From Swiss-Prot:
UniProt xrefs under HAMAP family: NAD_malic_enz
Cellular component GO terms, alphabetical: cytosol
Record-marked site positions (Important for activity): 267
Family under the similarity heading: Belongs to the malic enzymes family.
Quaternary structure and interacting proteins, as annotated: Homotetramer.
The reaction(s) this protein catalyses: (S)-malate + NAD(+) = pyruvate + CO2 + NADH; oxaloacetate + H(+) = pyruvate + CO2
Binding site residues for NAD(+): 154, 267, 415
Protein name in UniProt: NAD-dependent malic enzyme
UniProt-listed Gene3D superfamilies: Malic enzyme, N-terminal domain (3.40.50.10380), NAD(P)-binding Rossmann-like Domain (3.40.50.720)
InterPro entries: Aminoacid_DH-like_N_sf, Malic_enzyme_CS, Malic_N_dom, Malic_N_dom_sf, Malic_NAD-bd, Malic_OxRdtase, NAD(P)-bd_dom_sf, NAD_malic_enz_proteobac
Length: 562
């Protein structure tokens, strides 16, 4: 696939070629190409290399003073010259990742209709429920291999954004390419526009989505089913990633489709995989195993419960029983600790309740155990925040944990930054530098008592691009829990702290390509072992992954007729 030295035969010419983001080279078109593609006079005289173009683009990028303007600028480059966009992002990955994705993408979703410049991907509204096949045929990219789809109901920690949620599939697929080497020609972002219950969006005259309360129940389920069937007819081998669906839909959709099509839910499974990988690295750095930990969650939604189930599976793989593993995991939501007999729990929450026999000797002034009560009685060694509620990891909570645990592992994972349960600076100060910290959004290193503590970003971008690369390279037909487990273990093996005893918990973003390839290999090996892909040798698998990995370089063009 990575045949950059071979010419590419294309039928477009003139303004049509310059208006095609996947093919446009701008000032990098050669003299010969300008002649044969009717570009003479349409471009300045100078012929530039991609590095010269990137240098100019970076200077322009630096001229913008706020992150939203930088985001809009980068999206404009993406919509005019994709090769240049990805070269620019790869050259400045640590700087630009927070701009093209979290945390800036959250504000971009909230303001989607106000900053809209050009359509990208597909907007499939409920009004067109009987024409989904036609809409898929209208996609700009026709050789689609990976789809990221959302209905916009639970965008990060920001709630229902309607079609504004399209910013998430666009951003996620940009990371599939920038981090995982998936060609942008093979990607398709989709938003299922089933209305919105956000009164601000409905009242906004600029809102571009379907102005209607959200479709729910059987009508909603049937619409999603029609969409999945249409995708299967159009691109039967495509990987489908569900993204930012509300809790009431996320888990049921995953359960319905995970054994029917090649799909996964990044909020549930991707978040779980990167968290388990980070925990494995933290445990290794602390000289212990995951099965020895007592883990408390703040947030018992689909993401938190998905992480918990993945942790339990890893604990069991280390030799303890399922019952023992579940007794070491404590789920806390707004009503307190999930316990036997609690009303109105969802099925996936019921599997994670604490049995009464495990809490019968606990001391508390309230019948529902609070987070502080859990800290005091369970004495957890790991604390994970997926609540979307800022500031709930208070000084009292963290210091109570530190009383019983010399090196607490604290992961406030809520996105964006404004929703984080506690800042790394506070956690480091409250534990006198003893906590191992990873966050969902990027944070600067923390200085405390003369030491600098790098803060790992426990971000799904370390996981899902590698999963996608592994699945697509061997045309795997499913994404299984075991494949995801292998991705966690592969990520843990890349941890500087676990390997060297110093540095960050997770590798720097500058190493993301090697990390993604390592994860891809582990995921693909497990897929082959489980019979979800044709068997090949390890050497051939490495070659497939390398050959599949797209690089942002300009191809030579030759003209062909329509």
């Amino acid at each position: 696939m990575n045949n950059n030295k071979r010419p590419l035969y294309i039928p477009y010419a003139g303004p049509a070629l310059l208006s095609t983001p996947l093919l446009n080279k701008g000032s990098a078109f050669s003299t010969t190409e300008r002649k044969y593609f009717n570009l003479e006079g349409l471009l300045p005289e100078a012929i530039e290399s991609i590095e010269e173009q990137t240098g100019r683009a970076y200077k322009q990028y630096q001229s913008f003073e706020n992150d939203m303007d930088k985001h809009i600028y980068l999206r404009n480059i993406q919509d005019t010259n994709e090769t240049l966009f990805y070269r620019l992002v790869q050259n400045h990955i640590s700087e630009m990742m927070p701009i093209i994705y979290t945390p800036t993408v959250g504000a971009a979703c909230e303001n989607f209709s106000n900053i809209y410049r050009r359509g990208r991907g597909l907007f499939i509204s409920y009004e067109n429920k009987n024409r989904i096949d036609d809409l898929l045929n209208n996609a700009a990219n026709q050789n689609v291999k990976v789809i990221v789809v959302t209905d916009g109901e639970r965008i990060l920690g920001l709630g229902d954004q309607g079609i504004g949620g399209m910013g998430i599939p666009i951003g996620k697929l940009a990371l599939y390419t920038a981090c995982g080497g998936i060609s942008p020609a093979h990607t398709l972002p989709i938003v299922l526009d089933v209305g919105t219950n956000n009164p601000q969006r409905l009242a906004d005259p600029m809102y571009m989505g379907w102005r209607h309360p959200r479709v729910t129940g059987d009508e909603y389920a049937d619409f999603v089913e029609d969409f999945i069937q249409a995708v299967q007819r159009r691109w039967p081998e495509a990987l489908v990633q569900f993204e930012d669906f509300a809790q009431k839909n996320a888990m049921p959709l995953l359960e319905r489709y995970k054994n029917r099509i090649c799909c996964f839910n990044d909020d549930i499974q991707g978040t779980a995989a990167v968290t388990v990988g980070s925990l494995l690295a933290a445990c290794k750095a602390a000289g212990s195993s995951l099965s020895e930990q007592r883990v408390t969650f703040l947030g018992a939604g689909s993401a938190g419960c998905g992480i918990a189930e993945a942790i339990i599976a890893q604990m069991v793989s280390e030799g303890i029983s399922d019952a023992q593993a579940r007794s070491q995991v404590y789920m806390v939501d707004r009503w307190g600790l999930l316990q036997e007999g609690m009303p109105n729990l969802l099925d996936f929450q019921q599997r994670l309740v604490q049995k009464a026999e495990n809490t019968k000797d606990w001391i508390s002034e309230e019948p529902n155990f609070s987070l502080v009560d859990v800290m005091r009685n369970a004495k957890p060694t790991v604390l994970i925040g997926v609540s979307g509620a800022p500031g709930l990891f208070s000084k009292e909570v963290i210091q109570e944990m530190h009383k019983h645990c010399e090196r607490p592992i604290v992961f406030p994972l809520s996105n964006p930054t404004s929703r984080v349960e506690a800042t790394p600076n506070d956690i480091i100060r409250w534990t006198n530098g003893q906590a191992l910290v990873a966050t969902g959004s990027p944070f600067d290193p923390v200085s405390h008592n003369g030491q600098t503590y790098p803060i790992a970003q426990c971000n799904n971008s370390f996981i899902f691009p590698g999963i996608g690369l592994g699945v697509l390279a061997i045309k795997a037909t499913r994404v299984t829990d075991e494949m995801l487990m292998e991705s966690s273990r592969a990520l843990a093996e890349c941890s500087p702290l676990a390997i060297n005893g110093t540095g960050a918990l997770l590798p720097p973003l500058e190493e993301i390509h090697s990390v993604s390839k390592r994860i891809a290999f582990a995921v693909a090996k497990k897929a082959i072992e489980q019979g979800h892909a044709l068997e090949i040798t390890d050497e051939a698998l490495h070659q497939k992954i390398e050959s599949y990995f797209w690089k942002p370089v300009y191809r030579r063009y030759k003209r062909t007729a329509f």
